[in-house]
Amino acid sequence: MKQLHVQRYLEKVRSRKQHFLYPLLFKEYIYAFAHDYGLNGSIFYEPAEIIGNDNKSSSVLVKRLIIRMYQQNYLINSINHSNQNRFIGHNNYFYSHFFSLMISESFAVIMEIPFSLRLVSSPEEKEIPQFQNLRSIHSIFPFLEDKLSHLNYVSDILIPHPIHFEILVQILQCRIQDVPSLHLLRFFLHEYHNWNSLITSKKSIYVFSKENKRLFRLLYNFYVFECEFVFVFLRKQSSYLRLTSFGTFLERIHFYGKIEHLLVVYRNYFNKTLWFFTDPFMHYVRYQGKAILASKGTHLFMKKWKCYLVNFWQYYFHFWSQPHRIHINQLSNYSFHFLGYLSSVLRNLLVVRNQMLENSYLIDTVTKKFDTIVPVIPLIGSLSKAKFCTLLGHPISKPIWTDLSDCDIIDRFGRICRNLSHYYSGSSKKRSLYRIKYILRFSCARTLARKHKSTVRTFLQRLGSVLLEEFFTEEEQVLSLIFPKTTPFSLHGSHRERIWYLDIIRINDLVNH
């Protein structure tokens, strides 16, 4: 019923060829969507937990908050007279936090509506289910296996942050022409920055991203889209160049100005002539705030791309020059962290004897293979942060879980272990996972022993087989069927086959620490 209201309103807006999203802020059903899965049903979105379940979101409350936000010096007056204002309450930080969550979640919902409907109403709607497997994170690795083994250099790129809020609003303005909504967003972000500077000492955008996840993801995705749009434009321009007698491609690249909308490409940001060595074997992969640019070209070619990106960040997004965010390395001598894996290109030297009639000779052949392994030390650091072990990897108990039942404790530890094994099924060295499983298994035993005030040895003797079965993953069972001669216990050390799954759509929290 609620979704029907939204669709009717948007059909009316679409018939008038207008994009008025601001009135939706004052529709009661929007605030039900803002805190459940109602609108998009996406598993990527986790509903926000507003402080205090008794404080229900409503259009009346939001209207009051917006009016107060527009009042002059209301924040200073509210701090000085907080005891006299029942609406704000005794804790101004509670009020500001509650206000920011409510407004940001609702604002993000109405901003997502046009793009969600655009996707649903697209002519390719029937073809979308055929490509659901491409959503899997593991679908990236077969691509890297096929491409990186033929390339020479790789650039690790950290997308610049934090970005100024005003730049984010200007980027969003290219897609949404609703002036009142953008004005409210700009004012809200400005006031939120003032709250952080008055109430806390943290002024970074990191604070905003932690407390307003949905709105931050929306703004951040627009920002990344802007970066990649220009990057793709430059890549296409460099591929259209003509071949010279020296075997290089030279061309002047122009940046077009953003005049009317985002589809007009960029210009007038560089006054100098920019030179490119084109390379048909260039590949770009990004996840979250990190990207990889790999090429078969020379080191000079990669340095020119680095120069382009740094200048683009500086002139278009008004960043200070940040060349340290791009590191160029030779693939044959470098291992890079990406999506929780430690990846590299291995060189194997093969000697082949060739026999021709009475003569024989040896041929040295070099083969390259893309390799992925488990980064054990970072994972142990993540387990240490989560209080499963010490910094040295010694298992410790989890006191916060001692109030749970024995089955729940074993199930939680087993689920973490299975998720990690499932995600790292693409590792060529399964032995690295054995240490992680050892830590989780003994942490589980120590937690149970702490709960029952007993010793670890007692519980290992009593629940040894149960714990072993709980930490024995489905991947190992599948591999034992594929390789019947290999025992389950030797899979940790001897098996090197990699399995990529097409149902992994997010990184485990322990992987992403």
From Swiss-Prot:
Statement: the UniProt record of this protein carries the keyword Cytoplasm: no
Per UniProt, subcellular location reads as: Plastid, Chloroplast
**GO terms (BP aspect):** mRNA processing; RNA splicing; tRNA processing
Keyword terms, alphabetized = Chloroplast, mRNA processing, Plastid, RNA-binding, tRNA processing
Please, which domain of life does this record's source organism belong to?
Eukaryota
In the UniProt record, does the keyword Plastid occur? Answer: yes
Q: Spell out the molecular function terms from Gene Ontology.
A: RNA binding
Q: Might you report a single GO cellular component term?
A: chloroplast
Function, as annotated: Usually encoded in the trnK tRNA gene intron. Probably assists in splicing its own and other chloroplast group II introns.
The family line of this record is:
Belongs to the intron maturase 2 family. MatK subfamily.
Q: By its UniProt entry, which PANTHER family does this protein fall under?
A: MATURASE K
- Name of protein: Maturase K
